[in-house]
Amino acid sequence: MAQVDLDLLPLTGIDKVTFYKRDEITTDLICCELLFGDTTWSFHEELVGWDSLIEHLTRLPGFLADWFAQVSQPPFENREIVAFTRR
């Protein structure tokens, strides 16, 4: 199983954090995309280290604390939320 390596994700390099969910027929899968310059890294909640990734991202200045409530409801409906944008 893949694992999140926070050493490769310095907060100073993150330009944008976007959360969205994918309909997996019987469940929703919460996903996250991190923009680093011209590179996008994608993660999902089933990865080992997801909780550590979220804790890491909350240290970004102005990070949207209630992103989960906004992206998770209503169930089985496409939702996308930008939780951080570097200005």
What are the residue ranges of the model-derived segments?
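Phosphoinositide-binding peripheral membrane targeting modules
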Residues: 1-21
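Acidic, Ser/Thr- and proline-rich intrinsically disordered linker/docking segments
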Residues: 15-87
